[in-house]
Amino acid sequence: MESVSDSTAEVSATMDCDGNTEAFEKVKSKKREKCKRAAAEMDTQTEESSSSAPVKRPHFPALSGDQLGGGVDEMRKVPVPSHRYTPLKENWLKIFTPIVENLQLQVRFNLKTRQVEIKTCKETQDIGALTRAADFVKAFVLGFQVEDALALIRLDELFLETFDVTDVKPLKGDHLSRAIGRIAGKGGKTKFTIENVTKTRIVLADTKIHILGSFQNIKMARTAICNLILGSPPSKVYGNLRAVATRSAERF
């Protein structure tokens, strides 16, 4: 009898266990559900983007010089020394023609203030034209030929550099005159040689030296002139210039 009761208890226990297993529900992890939702959203977005037409970039028309300046006309004034009045008067047609026709600027010579005044107008297209025109007039006032100064309008990589002989070495009297004579050379030979090798233009105005050219070429010409001021013989300077010229030719 005891064995029969034990077997019935075991059967009821197994029945209870089976009932309990059916009562429990499996809970899915929330992380997996989130990942599945995110993947489904990404798929729908890619389908929508592929089906829709490609987005066009916004097109903004270029502003004119008048609009960039805010409608206010800008002006540059270049003072003219007394010894350059006559050359300015003789070459005035060559000076104002490229400024007015090519750069679309207004220019005049103020007789009261003795200055060349350059001004923008509604026809001005390039905002940097005013600076280039001022550099062009300044180069002519310093003593450069109109044809050489015109390169400042045509080319962007040209610069003007000015320094004094006494900035290199504090010379006075005859020593200063001899230094200037060494830079010029007999009949201007040394100056022309430096100009041709370095592809620059040099103006000697009393103790002032003005160089027109690209940054690298100005550096070469300035080094040669400084060596002459410090007392190097012209033959040595010529040799150094040739070496530098051959090096630069090999690079390019």
Curated annotation (Swiss-Prot):
Record Pfam families: KH_PNO1_2nd (PF22891)
CDD domains linked: KH-I_PNO1_rpt1 (cd22391), KH-I_PNO1_rpt2 (cd22392)
Keyword RNA-binding: yes
GO molecular function terms noted in the UniProt entry: RNA binding
Bias-annotated ranges (Basic residues): 28-37
Subcellular location, principal: nucleus
Top-rank lineage group of the source organism: Eukaryota
Family matches, as SMART domains: KH
Region of interest: Disordered: 1-72
Ranges of Polar residues composition bias in the record: 1-11
SUPFAM superfamilies for this protein: Eukaryotic type KH-domain (KH-domain type I)
Annotated keywords: Nucleus, RNA-binding
Gene Ontology biological process: ribosomal small subunit biogenesis
Family: Belongs to the PNO1 family.
Subunit structure comment from the entry: Part of the small subunit (SSU) processome, composed of more than 70 proteins and the RNA chaperone small nucleolar RNA (snoRNA) U3.
Protein's job: Part of the small subunit (SSU) processome, first precursor of the small eukaryotic ribosomal subunit. During the assembly of the SSU processome in the nucleolus, many ribosome biogenesis factors, an RNA chaperone and ribosomal proteins associate with the nascent pre-rRNA and work in concert to generate RNA folding, modifications, rearrangements and cleavage as well as targeted degradation of pre-ribosomal RNA by the RNA exosome. Positively regulates dimethylation of two adjacent adenosines in the loop of a conserved hairpin near the 3'-end of 18S rRNA.
Name the UniProt record assigns to this protein: RNA-binding protein PNO1
Species of provenance: Danio rerio (Zebrafish)
